Amino acid sequence: MSTAEQRLRLMQLASSNLPVGGYSWSQGLEWAVEAGWVLDVAAFERWQRRQMTEGFFTVDLPLFARLYRACEQGDIAAAQRWTAYLLACRETRELREEERNRGAAFARLLSDWQPDCPPPWRSLCQQSQLAGMAWLGVRWRIALPEMALSLGYSWIESAVMAGVKLVPFGQQAAQQLILRLCDHYAAEMPRALAAPDGDIGSATPLAAIASARHETQYSRLFRS
């Protein structure tokens, strides 16, 4: 696959039109807004930076790097172990359901894009979108850092668009937020990908509480 094709594949994977349900979940933000924890753009940016620094950089990216290497080596046992670890790091039923639902949706895409994906790997990809992204990145020969950029941009954009609906704020403010959050992501991503095993784990208790409370929130825009 040429460099141009690989870049276009990355854009497709980061697209908001990718049918994996990214915009269906708020990851606790909806409750945080109702509770008065996030009331304006500045509070949203602080909230999202905390989720990135103490969650995405310490769980998602380090585990994505391990899944990618397991896929490179064809080590299904290691990939299964790290996927199970990822699900264990999702601290609420809602977050685990999101992970599994996104994985199942991505696996359906994978069946169309790469129908020769071996059944054990396809079954694993159904449990987590990160596993599917890792397998596909290796198959399409897209390097780990580039895949991580696509993954991060998709996560940032989904979070900001949830903020637009919930906080709320306008599209111009949203684009400024995406720029700043992307700058922070790009600066810290290499360190997160290289994190040792002992550093893996989240430290976002408020996000976990918000997600748990969202499961029984009276009126919701987002899935639970």
Curated annotation (Swiss-Prot):
GO cellular component: cytoplasm
Protein family (similarity comment): Belongs to the UreF family.
Stated name of the protein: Urease accessory protein UreF
Annotated InterPro entries: UreF, UreF_sf
Region (Required for interaction with the urease apoprotein-UreDG complex): 210-224
Deletion consequences: Cells do not express urease.
Localisation per UniProt entry: Cytoplasm
Organism name: Klebsiella aerogenes
HAMAP family in the record: UreF
